[in-house]
Design a protein with these regions (language model features):
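Mature, function-bearing regions of proteins
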Residues: 1-172
């Protein structure tokens, strides 16, 4: 999640971890946004340190993917470590079409930490949005099939915990 700077921000995905008073993960919320300004959250129950959630795709993220398929979502975020890794895999009929990985370290959100992060990573609030549009232009020029944006669904849906099931797409 990138903080709003000078009133500007775009976060394709933000992940929230809800913990109990003992520090154990209880709920994961994956908040997904598209470039049309729509947002949808996939929420699921955590069952330990290796939780894999599966959610039916009901939110239009990219005009280059159909409204079909499943997401496999996994987060590795130990309450006693600052390392965080998020893996998201989009599959249609069991075939992986897109895999996205986010890695980083947790930091306290202060003015100094934001400035230090901006300088160290050369990130800026609209960089993800610009990168998405550049990639979309490349796909469009390659004549990749284009899917129109449907009406946005309800604001959230529940993801199923599939940690104990076999994972044919290798997310686990």
């Amino acid at each position: 999640t990138f903080p709003r700077i000078l009133g500007v921000a775009f976060n394709p995905v933000s992940v929230y971890v809800l913990r109990d008073s003992a520090g154990a993960d209880r709920v994961y919320i994956y908040e997904v946004r598209n470039t049309f300004g729509d947002m949808h959250s996939y929420a699921g129950i955590a069952d330990g340190t290796d939780t894999v959630l599966e959610a039916t795709k009901i939110f239009h993220v990219s005009p280059f993917f159909p409204m079909a398929g499943e997401y496999r979502l996994r987060i590795s975020a130990d309450a006693h470590s600052d390392r965080v890794q998020v893996l998201m895999r989009y599959t249609v009929d069991g075939v992986a079409n897109l895999t996205a990985t986010l890695r980083g370290t947790r930091e306290s959100l202060t003015n100094l930490s934001v400035v230090r992060s901006l300088l160290a990573t050369r990130q800026w609030p609209l960089r993800p949005l610009v990168s998405i549009h550049v990639e979309a232009a490349r796909l469009w020029l390659k004549k990749v099939p284009f899917y129109s944006r449907p009406e946005p669904p309800q604001p959230w849906s529940r993801a199923r915990n599939v940690s104990r099931q076999s994972t044919t797409v290798g997310v686990k």
